[in-house]
Design a protein with these regions (language model features):
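Membrane-embedded alpha-helical bundles of multi-pass enzymes
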Residues: 2-213
């Protein structure tokens, strides 16, 4: 019973996070993306639920692909127009699901190998490694047909000041920074639940955010 409840909660967190990410990718700014990424970190131990996060984020943010219908203007028969547009949209969601799921799987694998001792240094290394892997993946994706998948550009137009950091380390670096912000928010919530260190975590994070701006 408890395992089923935990699984349902995990799915709910992944679904809500994916919806928030989808809104964040269309609206821009940290207001949506920070809690979305915090929820992604909270479910990252489950590649399947992480895939749900990725799928919902892209299906919501790229729903404009359905507006390509009718595709008769590029020679697609009217009867096939909507199925083709829907297939493109679903493919985008599936691609995002696979990529985010692979990222989560890699994180769980690394957590059980390179960082299995559980010390502070190991956890910090794991955090920086996973955030950097995401950022590097966005750099590589930017040079591929999947260039549209990524959170690096989601800071615009909502947070131009933080987006300005791109002049030093690019969109991949912005993605890494956002992953770190999401992790901080997640850890602050965990500290609040434990009743230990929440205020300190919140204060340090806000100071760093202020400096980044």
């Amino acid at each position: 019973m408890t395992m089923g409840r935990d699984r349902s909660l995990l799915l709910l967190q992944g679904a809500i996070g994916g919806v928030l990410a989808g809104v964040g990718l269309t609206q821009g700014g940290l207001f949506w993306m920070a809690p979305a990424l915090a929820l992604l970190w909270s479910v990252s131990r489950s590649p399947g639920v992480s895939s749900l996060w990725g799928a919902l984020a892209v299906l919501l943010s790229h729903r404009w692909l359905l507006a390509l219908h009718p595709l008769t203007w590029i020679g697609v028969p009217a009867v096939l127009s909507f199925p083709v547009a829907a297939s493109i949209w679903l493919f985008c969601g599936a691609a995002a699901a696979v990529l985010v799921g692979l990222w989560a799987w890699l994180g769980t694998w690394l957590a059980h190998t390179a960082t299995r001792d559980g010390g502070f240094r190991a956890k910090a290394f794991h955090l920086l490694l996973m955030a950097s892997i995401w950022g590097l993946a966005e750099v590589l994706l930017a040079r591929s047909p999947l260039f549209w998948i990524g959170v690096g550009g989601s800071l615009l137009p909502g947070d131009r000041a933080l987006a300005g950091l791109a002049r030093w380390f690019g969109a991949g670096g912005l993605a890494t920074v956002q992953l770190l912000i999401g992790w901080w928010l997640w850890q602050t919530v965990l500290a609040w639940r434990r009743g230990i260190g929440a205020f300190k975590s919140l204060l340090i994070g806000l100071l760093l955010l202020a400096l980044a701006h």
